[in-house]
A protein has these predicted regions:
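Transmembrane helical core of 7TM receptor-like proteins
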Residues: 1-344
Length: 344
């Protein structure tokens, strides 16, 4: 795999990434990998596939509903909900990479994937996950400005600045995804063609990578880790100042209202960070464990599933927007029935 980065005169960055349809494994050219999955029994494979499909559809519906509410309701046209809509989009795209492919493999009992398909999974999942970290960082900065500098909020968090922060988050995510993919697939593999996972993820591919060729992989991984640590530090500092400011509010009602806007974001960030750290910071081993696959399920499914629930559970604005949407749909349905009843 080759990755070329071109810097244009106008400041634009162009990526040219090419992935070969075959790689070298133990001096033998191969064209794909095999997933280990959760079971070797065909019936259990089908059950697992259907279970994942139900979870996937539920996550998609919840995130699409939240995106629809934010888009249609005028009261939700604020920077906080703009970031939340982009977070839901990233969650939606992120979970759509591994789960549909796993469902198809479970139904067809075919656990193989091509080199191009595996590289695409690594690129997309790394891009969306990295972009989500930066969007979460932008959301913490938004809450910091709203609570610690409310008089300057409209100027600092203008629509142009919000679009810029989200655009930079997506762009950095794509760039990191390209670096990860190039680092992994630019060198030959020395292990088995069986990936001890149900999708192509970086730790599993590290298990079958040449130990003496891991310098390129760890270099690209180190860049992402450093940027991730910068994001974590920014979020921690933001909430340190937020909590210090909130505790100075004289009334309990004011403190509760301020905490209510921050705790959902902090909860989402903690879940995302905890699951990602377990999966990606764990030292790769040569033995596959069912525990690793179960935690990968939590990493790929849990944050996208819980994010809409956490943000709407105690959010009166989202609940009000949902009631308005239901009333509009019911009124349109009643009007349609009335027109049909009085028609010729």
């Amino acid at each position: 795999m080759t990755l070329e980065v071109h810097f244009e005169n106008n400041g634009a960055i162009l990526l040219n990434m090419a992935v070969e349809d075959s790689i070298v494994l133990n001096d033998t050219r191969i064209t794909g990998f095999f997933f280990m999955g959760f079971s070797d029994v065909p019936e259990l494979q089908t059950v697992c596939g259907l279970f994942f499909l139900v979870m996937y559809l539920a996550v998609i519906m919840n995130n699409l509903l939240l995106i629809t509410l934010i888009t249609l309701d005028l009261k939700l046209q604020t920077p906080m909900y703009f970031f939340l809509k982009n977070l839901s989009l990233l969650d939606l795209f992120f979970i759509s990479v591994p789960i549909p492919n796993f469902f198809i493999n479970s139904i067809t009992h075919n656990n193989s994937i091509s080199i191009l398909g595996c590289a695409l999974q690594v690129f997309l999942m790394a891009s969306f996950a990295s972009g989500e970290v930066f969007v979460l960082t932008a959301m913490s900065y938004d809450r910091y400005i709203a609570i610690c500098s409310p008089l300057h909020y409209e100027v600092i968090m203008s629509s142009g600045n919000c679009v810029l922060m989200v655009g930079v988050s997506w762009a950095i995510g794509v760039l990191l995804g390209a670096f990860y993919t190039a680092g992994i697939f630019s060198k030959p593999f020395c292990g088995s063609i069986v990936i001890p996972q149900f999708f192509c993820d970086i730790p599993s591919l590290l298990r079958i990578s040449c130990s003496h060729r891991l310098v390129v992989i760890y270099a690209s991984f180190g860049i992402g880790l450093c940027l991730g640590m910068v994001c974590v530090i920014c979020i921690v500092l933001s909430y340190f100042h937020i909590f210090s400011t909130v505790l100075k509010i004289p009334t309990n009602k004011g403190q509760s209202k301020a905490f209510a806007t921050c705790l959902p974001h902090l909860t989402v960030f903690s879940i995302f960070l905890a699951t990602a750290c377990f999966v990606y910071l764990k030292s790769p081993s040569n033995t596959a464990s069912i525990t690793d696959r179960l935690f990968s399920v939590l990493y790929t499914v849990l944050p996208p599933a819980l994010n809409p629930v956490i943000y709407s559970l105690r959010n009166t604005d989202v609940k009000c927007a949902l009631r308005n949407l239901q009333q509009n749909l019911c009124s349109r349905g009643s009007l349609h029935l009335t027109v049909q009843s009085i028609g010729p």
